[in-house]
């Protein structure tokens, strides 16, 4: 068996083409969607992510800007800027690129963003709404994964789903979305005993652990849908995911590649959330 590859890059482009008409309609009514990304420090990976987010917005006609601070900036300055952006009617989405320098209280910064402009879906109010099954904004990576399930005609109802990783950014919201979709969900972490026992029973396997090629083919149930959220850079400079693609490709029914899988969908759903925020503000 050779798995069907779920092409996240192609799906992302298809969705973005559809977004253009929504952006044009909003702009014509004086509600051009606007996203501001705040970057503290000069982490090379974060700079790439921020550039891709800003360029993604501009490519479909949205307004976007990057605000950069030196890593030594005090937290109060950033909080004051967030308060200013919260009050700006032309800005519909505010995103603070993580991680922040160690002297920052990450939770306090994320909570300072208005829940109505929290397009990352990290504000406690939005996390609670997601847990209740009535989300305002879905965190972008899990949102992208759900769109991939939708595109691949993956029926989640009654399926055994295993999520490896329990981060607030991916693992926890991913588990909630799967629960809300009717799956039976197990969340595994670094302390899980006999991980293979759980993964080998999974109809849906989501790997978000941050370890290169961590999930191997012998851990996968034949015919399973394998979603690789990881992005890891190897010593030779190449990118790979948390899944050993070659071995899992021969066992899985559907699988996402790295690169070209979940990654492009993450930024695409950030655009979706920002457009949705603008539509709500416009009463559409």
From Swiss-Prot:
Cystine connections: none
Pathway the protein acts in: One-carbon metabolism; tetrahydrofolate interconversion
SUPFAM superfamilies in the cross-refs: Aminoacid dehydrogenase-like, N-terminal domain, NAD(P)-binding Rossmann-fold domains
The keyword Amino-acid biosynthesis is annotated on this UniProt entry: yes
Superkingdom field: Bacteria
GO molecular function list: methenyltetrahydrofolate cyclohydrolase activity; methylenetetrahydrofolate dehydrogenase (NADP+) activity
Summary of subunit composition and partner proteins: Homodimer.
Function: Catalyzes the oxidation of 5,10-methylenetetrahydrofolate to 5,10-methenyltetrahydrofolate and then the hydrolysis of 5,10-methenyltetrahydrofolate to 10-formyltetrahydrofolate.
PANTHER family with a match to the protein in the record: C-1-TETRAHYDROFOLATE SYNTHASE, CYTOPLASMIC (PTHR48099:SF5), C-1-TETRAHYDROFOLATE SYNTHASE, CYTOPLASMIC-RELATED (PTHR48099)
Family in the record: Belongs to the tetrahydrofolate dehydrogenase/cyclohydrolase family.
UniProt-recorded name of the protein: Bifunctional protein FolD
Native organism: Dechloromonas aromatica (strain RCB)
Lineage, highest ranks first: Bacteria, Pseudomonadati, Pseudomonadota, Betaproteobacteria, Rhodocyclales
Gene, per the UniProt record: folD
């Amino acid at each position: 068996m050779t798995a069907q590859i779920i092409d996240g890059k192609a799906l992302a482009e298809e969705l973005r083409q559809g977004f253009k008409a929504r952006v044009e309609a909003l702009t014509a009514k004086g509600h051009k969607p606007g996203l501001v990304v705040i970057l503290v420090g000069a982490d090379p990976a974060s700079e790439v992510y921020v550039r891709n987010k800003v360029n993604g917005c501009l490519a479909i006609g949205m307004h976007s800007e990057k605000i950069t601070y030196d890593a030594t900036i005090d937290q109060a300055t950033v909080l004051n800027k967030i308060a200013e952006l919260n009050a700006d009617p032309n800005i519909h989405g505010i995103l603070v690129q993580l991680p922040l320098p160690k002297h920052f209280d990450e939770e306090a910064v994320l909570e300072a963003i208005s829940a109505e402009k929290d397009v990352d879906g990290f504000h406690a109010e939005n996390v609670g709404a997601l847990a209740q099954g009535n989300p305002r904004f879905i965190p972008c990576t899990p949102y992208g994964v759900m769109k991939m399930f939708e595109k691949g005609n993956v029926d989640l109802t009654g399926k055994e789903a295993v999520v490896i990783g329990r981060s607030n950014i991916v693992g926890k919201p991913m588990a909630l979305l799967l629960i809300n979709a009717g799956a039976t969900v197990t969340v595994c972490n670094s302390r899980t005993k006999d991980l293979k026992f759980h993964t080998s029973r999974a109809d849906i396997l989501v790997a978000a652990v941050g370890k290169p090629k961590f999930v191997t083919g012998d851990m996968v149930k034949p015919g399973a849908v394998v979603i690789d959220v990881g992005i890891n850079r190897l010593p030779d400079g190449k990118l790979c995911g948390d899944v050993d693609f070659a071995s899992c490709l021969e066992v899985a029914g559907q699988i996402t590649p790295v690169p070209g899988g979940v990654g492009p969908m993450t930024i695409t759903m950030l655009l979706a959330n920002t457009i949705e925020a603008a539509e709500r503000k416009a009463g559409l």
